[in-house]
């Protein structure tokens, strides 16, 4: 029993909708007693996400988990903390600066992360190949999903 909160940035962010559909379907099948509440639409912006959270916070009972496919995690956590509803598990996507700080502080359980540089390199190579600006055959590499916990946070790779 309890509530699982889900959050996407907005309907236009590619990949978030597919994640949400798969997650909700699996959760409904495996844990039918959990109530799923959607807190999507803040576009990962603190103020907008805070407004959305304030509009739903009163109806939240025991928050067992949060699955955030988008941003705005600081706003979500702050609203839940103010309501005394911090979740048992909080899962976020992408190891950006905000999520890095939150996981270092122990406020996130884990972050699902993939290397955006590999994804961008694939897009750039496909562009070059399409316009016949690359003579070698197109070879794409899948970016591997990493599960980042407070115990295995990778070092920051900065390029100058």
List each model region and its residues:
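Hinge/cleft segment of the Venus flytrap/periplasmic-binding protein
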Residues: 11, 27, 118-160
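Short beta-strand elements at the ligand-binding edges of bilobed clamshell
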Residues: 105-117
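Flexible loop/hinge segments that line or gate small-molecule binding clefts
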Residues: 96-104, 108
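Hydrophobic alpha-helical segments within soluble ligand-binding/sensing domains
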Residues: 1-2, 49-50, 99, 115-132
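Short hydrophobic segments within beta-strands
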Residues: 5-7, 67-68, 148
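Short, solvent-exposed amphipathic alpha-helices that sit
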Residues: 14-34, 48, 52, 75-76, ...
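Hydrophobic alpha-helical
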Residues: 23, 37-98
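Short beta-strand segments enriched in small/hydrophobic residues
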Residues: 2-12
């Amino acid at each position: 029993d309890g509530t699982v909160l889900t959050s996407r940035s907005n309907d236009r962010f590619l990949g978030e909708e597919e994640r949400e559909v798969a997650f909700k379907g699996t959760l409904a099948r495996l844990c039918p007693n959990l109530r799923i509440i959607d807190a999507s639409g803040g576009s990962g912006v603190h103020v907008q996400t805070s407004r959305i959270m304030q509009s739903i916070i009163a109806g939240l009972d025991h928050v067992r988990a949060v699955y955030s496919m988008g941003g705005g995690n600081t706003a979500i956590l702050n609203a839940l903390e103010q309501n005394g509803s911090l979740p048992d598990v909080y899962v976020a996507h992408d190891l950006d600066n905000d999520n890095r700080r939150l996981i270092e502080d122990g406020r996130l359980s884990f972050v699902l992360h993939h290397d955006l540089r590999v994804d961008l390199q694939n897009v750039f190579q496909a562009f070059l190949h399409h316009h016949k600006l690359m003579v070698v055959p197109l070879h794409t590499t899948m970016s591997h999903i990493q599960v980042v916990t407070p115990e295995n946070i990778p070092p920051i790779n900065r390029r100058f």
